[in-house]
């Protein structure tokens, strides 16, 4: 079956070579006569998989030795709770509010008993269309939480704030798509289903001195327990870890994160440049804050937006509908999304615009 152009914000497009390798190895991994889905997580075969995955992500992101790499479950949403539970330790937790997911992280942190939350900067006053300036954080705070890419609103934080306290980053929608210096962060977390692999896996990178600060946490929610058990306190999402390892190998073959970022910038520039010169489509995001991976755009009417999404779907451009809280359209151009798909989308946008400039709406 011919593949379509999948603009889903997550779960998202995976590299075709990875899917093909998964297909080849599905019934018998490494000559074992068993699928990866059937391997014991205590087996040597799976231990090699998770060890290789960790080694690759350390190489790709330049993760120092004094950081632990954890392959967990529960999505980035569980980290909204685990971070304050493990790191706040009676101190103030400081957050930057740049979008829907940041708001959820803030809301969850406020539910943790004994955690005082301060929102130090926000872009909500202009519908999260920009990245706010972040003031100096008091040294008595536990951490500063930021969201490096706002999937729904289409903004990104490329410059990590210098901070006297650990910076915690939700990188779910731009991890491995842009180069970041891991040493600037105390903790990084990301749901896998955008740039890493299938849903069900969460990557956590945490500096060792931040582990074990709080006693008596539930074992599954304790970074210390997870680190001491090599991400296998309970059965990890074995198949998702395996696919992530293959994705890491693919990224390495593309020239690493720097090579991927160069391609992502080229893809994003094509679409942004077209939108900028268009008198039919527009971007709701300030130019300096525009994401490379999630690009929202709108026409001048909800009726045209609806018609565009419907006709795009019929023409093989899937999952372009914007998030229900924002509307319009959103093209998610994650690492595995081909540049040919961007070029094809632009051609379709031009055709749609030319057919509608007389005001006709066909829904």
Curated annotation (Swiss-Prot):
Give the cofactor note text.
Binds 1 pyridoxal phosphate per subunit.
GO MF entry, a single one: O-phospho-L-serine:2-oxoglutarate aminotransferase activity
Query: A single GO CC term, please?
Result: cytoplasm
Q: What's the cofactor?
A: pyridoxal 5'-phosphate
Please provide the record's keywords in A-Z order.
Answer: Amino-acid biosynthesis, Aminotransferase, Cytoplasm, Pyridoxal phosphate, Pyridoxine biosynthesis, Serine biosynthesis, Transferase
Q: Which family does it belong to?
A: Belongs to the class-V pyridoxal-phosphate-dependent aminotransferase family. SerC subfamily.
User: Do you know which HAMAP family this protein is assigned to?
Assistant: SerC_aminotrans_5 (MF_00160)
**What name is this protein filed under?**
Phosphoserine aminotransferase
